[in-house]
Amino acid sequence: SHPVNLGLTGGFQTGCRYALEHGYDAVIQFDADGQHMPQYVMPMVERMEQDGADIVIGSRFVDVEKPVSARMIGSRLITSIIKLTCGKTINDPTSGMRLFNHKMVAEFVRRFDFGPEPDSVAFLMRKGAKVSEVQVQMRERQAGESYLNAWKSISYMARTCMSILFVQWF
């Protein structure tokens, strides 16, 4: 428990630190709104073992084409920038369902302000991390309200793209 809300990065790093201290092999990230379904955890673990992956993303778009919508423009842009900078396609870079192996968990604990976001995944890929994806289905939001509105979504996508292109190289 934190005395104040430390946000996604602070909460994720606390969970990673706990996992390291208690000898866990991996950490899975779920959004707190109920979209992610637990039946996909084992297929993600199996993919990590089969592929020797460091990160496995629960993707909506491995076998299903991304819909054409304003919401998906940012996702397509991030996918393109990751392909340009890392040489690999991530079909669903903004998915909040990700599995990280022990080595990646240690990276998140070691680096200040290094959260489980597409720019951090791209940085780790450039450092040699292997990323795989597993097709998943996601439910509509089951609880809470999104903090994102149109302006915040545009701002998030712009910051993420700038970070992948410029900041994460250092």
Feature locations, PLM:
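Cell-envelope/extracellular polymer assembly enzymes that use nucleotide-activated donors
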Residues: 119
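Structural signal for conserved beta-strand scaffold positions within catalytic alpha/beta enzyme cores
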Residues: 1, 57, 133-135
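Catalytic donor-sugar/metal-binding loop of nucleotide-sugar-dependent glycosyltransferases
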Residues: 89, 111-112, 122-139
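Glycine/small-residue-rich loop that forms an oxyanion/phosphate-binding "nest" at active or ligand-binding sites
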Residues: 35
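Cys/His-dense Zn2+-coordinating finger/ribbon modules
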Residues: 32
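Active-site-adjacent helix/loop segment of glycosyltransferases
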Residues: 170
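Acceptor/aglycone-binding surface of glycosyltransferases and processive sugar-polymer synthases
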Residues: 3-4, 8-21, 26, 38-114, ...
